From Swiss-Prot:
The keyword Cytoplasm does not apply. The gene is mtbB2. One of its GO terms (molecular function) is dimethylamine methyltransferase activity. It comes from the Archaea. It comes from Methanosarcina mazei (strain ATCC BAA-159 / DSM 3647 / Goe1 / Go1 / JCM 11833 / OCM 88). This is Dimethylamine methyltransferase MtbB2. Signal peptide: none annotated.
Amino acid sequence: MATEYALRMGDGKRIFLTKDKIMEELEAGMANASDLGEIPDLSGDEIDKLAEILMMPGKTVSVEQGMEVPVTHDIGTLRLDGDQGNSGVGIPSSRLVGCMMHERAFGADTMELGHIDYSYKPVKPVVANECQAMEVCQQNMIIPLFYGAMPNMGLYYTPDGPFENPGDLMKAFKIQEAWDSMEHAAAHLTRDTVWVMQKLFASGADGVNFDTTAAAGDADMYGTLHAIEALRKEFPDMYIEAGMAGECVLGMHGNLQYDGVTLAGLWPHQQAPLIAKAGANVFGPVCNTNTSKTSPWNLARAVNFMKAAVQASSIPCHVDMGMGVGGIPMLETPPIDAVTRASKAMVEIAGVDGIOIGVGDPLGMPISHIMASGMTGMRAAGDLVARMQFSKNMKIKEAKEYVAKKLNVETMDLADEYVMRELREELDIGVITSVPGAAKGIAAKMNIEKLLDVKINSCNLFRKQTR
């Protein structure tokens, strides 16, 4: 009797497959991506490598030593203090505590602050509160800290917003009116996002994370691209990450273009050049999980799409890897076996420059991804490598080589806690454990500025405030 391996369905249910069935599913998932995106197939060796990862006997797996990548985040601290019946675990805690827990306890390379109603539009009435939270976090933290939210253009339509719902207009065959409504909403999305981030950047934010770009279709992406363009023009040093909502941009409008390219129907490898053109530092491509398909099918499909996106992108790619995307099952508590296998495959086969950790409980998301493929933040040098990716648009190899040269170590040492512990204390660039007298917060970041030859926004704010 053939050996069967414990794997998952796209909804997280455990299944058992033989090696022959796994290979069949891998080929089918890969072919689906190749057909839809008109991209090359994975090589035979890559399919074999995927199968090897899936059939590894351990519950958790990880990347080979030296292949670790930085992680970024969606939903911020909501996975800790959120309690809305999804993936938040409802721990009563401040956002400062949540951010520092990711930095100090989870070993995150970067973190983000976000509002409980995680979209830019609802932030407007409480932006002063968000600015104060950002200032306090920046005074206490060392890793790059973004402000993150969803463009969420749907909030600009009735009954939540001022513009008539284009879906209702199209049902009434009022096509021109529907187009007008989407264009007006996109303009407001751009305006609001820029306004919010002007305030947050003035309060020390390292940058902005656009989470689930194009969730409301091509007009949503249109508004977001113009927001990125405006922010880059006004703030040349702002860190900007643009993560997508889905693998294909829905053509709700159908006629909108950016840089002469029609947005409707774009796949990840076609989205990447436009995100870079607008001025983002990091692109977060997405591949949706099909809950009725197996994990081999979903993972091969996702890896194929992401490999093409990485090759087409001139900026680093941090693949979105929350529940329901990136080959990960659609489950609030993502199975650790599936998460770590997907994380390893994305780094070793797709060649991604980082992982954008998405929705899921703390153990299933940040802890699993960081254990599988992360650089462990301040425990080693993950925060430094992440800063170079965002400061200079460096892909993973270049960023690691740059930081290693500055530290006078080998690139493999950048994820070595033993090497980096002593070095961080010696250079006074912040250590993860509490050491009396060691530089913390702004002081540590000022030393990082000198070490890496970069400017850090919260340090600039501090310098302006001193007399």
